[in-house]
A protein has these predicted regions:
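Sec-dependent N-terminal signal peptides
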Residues: 7-8
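Long, well-ordered alpha-helical scaffolding segments within enzyme catalytic domains
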Residues: 69-78
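C-terminal motif of bacterial Sec signal peptides marking the signal peptidase cleavage site
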Residues: 12-15
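Positively charged n-region of N-terminal signal peptides that target proteins for export
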Residues: 1-4
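Polar/charged, Gly/Pro-rich intrinsically disordered segments
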Residues: 21-67, 82-112
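Bacterial signal peptide processing site
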Residues: 17-19
Length: 112
């Protein structure tokens, strides 16, 4: 019985593994974000998080439906080959970017 429980525990621990994005996915995300920044459409920065969410920073203004923007960018990112769980939109004035993380209130969101 102990062997069975130990085996199940080991499978659970090793089977769950890390779900961090691959280097290929990070590179695709970087290219996609750079294309959005270069398009001069109000996106100033972006990051693919370790949890596999794409975070885009915009200059937020009242009355905008940022959930709709997030849905649009999620669909577009998926057509570009990104395998992400979703897209979050943050206000560029109230966020911080790090390597694989972003802090700040999510003002728009869309999920796969």
């Amino acid at each position: 019985m102990k062997k069975i429980l130990l085996t199940i525990l080991a499978i659970s621990l090793f089977g769950c593994g890390e779900n961090k994005p691959s280097q290929e996915q990070k590179d695709k995300a970087d290219r996609y974000v750079q294309s959005l920044v270069d398009a001069d459409i109000g996106i100033y920065k972006g990051e693919l998080t370790d949890a596999n969410f794409l975070i885009l920073a915009v200059d937020a203004y009242s009355g905008a439906n940022f959930d709709a923007y997030a849905r649009t960018y999620l669909e577009e990112a998926q057509t570009k080959g990104l395998e992400i769980k979703g897209v979050y939109i943050v206000d560029i004035k109230d966020c911080q970017f790090g390597d694989g993380w972003v802090s700040g209130d999510r003002i728009g969101k869309a999920f796969k």
